[in-house]
From Swiss-Prot:
Domain Tyr recombinase per the UniProt entry, residue ranges: 105-289
Protein name listed in UniProt: Tyrosine recombinase XerC
Protein localization: Cytoplasm
Active site (UniProt): 145, 169, 241, 244, 267, 276
Pfam families hit by this protein: Phage_int_SAM_1, Phage_integrase
GO molecular function terms noted in the UniProt entry: DNA binding; tyrosine-based site-specific recombinase activity
Quaternary assembly: Forms a cyclic heterotetrameric complex composed of two molecules of XerC and two molecules of XerD.
GO CC, one annotated term: cytoplasm
UniProt keywords, alphabetically: Cell cycle, Cell division, Chromosome partition, Cytoplasm, DNA integration, DNA recombination, DNA-binding
Family that this chain belongs to: Belongs to the 'phage' integrase family. XerC subfamily.
Length: 295
């Protein structure tokens, strides 16, 4: 039996939970697993870290009631308690994770100069470094989801017009745009680094490749981003989600309207985008406090 099946069997046979309750637990585990599969890859329940859980809860919490989010965390805590007790995982990643009551955590983001610092640090000219620079630049310039960037094909790129046709969630297509600086990094990758990486899969249409010349996985991209930011001295926990948050925050801080940002992010519901207005207001408040002459 899989770890999920063992847990569900335990709930049904040892705890005598109703079929409806067992199904609710099953759905909560499936939702978390699906999120990780689409945002970095699912390495197995025994490899999920506290950071993975925090990112999942942050992303999910933007569109759920606090009571629903609490239930999802409770399901994961119960699951990992059983796995830990039976020696099926070495550590419980849910330990010490708590939700703020009645208040959603604001998305973490990087400022423009911080992203610029990271991009400038990727300057040794090696194929993987050139690839990583293009990845970071595109995440920040477009606000794409990790799964969307991972699945990018050459035919989706319009370099001349600085556009990308993105195949988003629910098979919904949209266009995103990139600036001249990002175009420069992308072209350098496509013209110089990508051909040198293209070894075992000469016919692949995937834009971003791993060191073996094969399409890179979401997990590979997430790991690369984390290592890049850690090496640049900014944080040990950077994730592509935070570059997406950074894009949205930068757009709003520079005057973009909420509906436009919603379209660029591919959000179905405007309320999902509205959380970034709180981030922007927080930024504006800090700027006011710092620069207004009367304290």
């Amino acid at each position: 039996m899989t770890l999920e099946e063992q847990f569900l069997s335990y709930l049904k046979n040892e705890r005598s939970y109703s079929p409806k309750t067992v199904l609710a637990y099953q759905k909560d585990l499936a939702a978390a697993k699906k999120f990780w599969q689409e945002n970095g890859g699912f390495p197995g329940w025994d490899q999920i870290s506290r950071r993975d859980l925090e990112i999942y809860l942050l992303a999910t919490g933007q569109k759920l009631a606090s009571s629903t989010l609490s239930r999802k965390l409770s399901s994961l805590k119960s699951f990992y308690r059983l796995l830990t007790r039976r020696g099926l995982v070495k550590a419980d990643p849910t330990v010490a994770i708590q939700l703020r009551r009645g208040k959603k955590k604001l998305p973490e983001f990087f400022y423009q100069d911080e992203v610029g610092q990271v991009i400038r640090s990727l300057n040794d000219g090696k194929p993987l470094t050139v690839r990583n620079r293009a990845i970071v630049a595109l995440f920040y310039a477009t606000g794409m989801r990790l799964s969307e960037l991972t699945d990018l094909k050459i035919k989706q790129l319009d370099l001349e017009n600085g556009m990308i046709l993105v195949h988003g969630k629910g098979n919904k297509d949209r266009y995103v745009f990139f600036d001249q600086e990002s175009k420069k990094y992308l072209e350098e990758y496509l013209q110089v680094a990508r051909p040198s990486l293209l070894k075992n899969e000469p016919d692949t249409e995937a834009v971003f490749l791993n060191k073996l010349g094969r399409p890179i996985s979401s997990r590979g991209i997430a790991k690369a981003v984390q290592q890049i930011f850690q090496k640049a001295g900014l944080t040990a926990g950077a994730h592509p989600h935070e570059l997406r948050h950074s894009f949205a925050t930068a757009m709003l801080n520079n005057g973009a309207d909420l509906r436009s940002v919603q379209e660029l992010l591919g959000h179905e519901d405007l309320s999902t985008t509205q959380i970034y207005t709180h981030v922007s207001m927080q930024h504006l408040t800090a700027e006011y406090r710092q620069h207004f002459p009367r304290k």
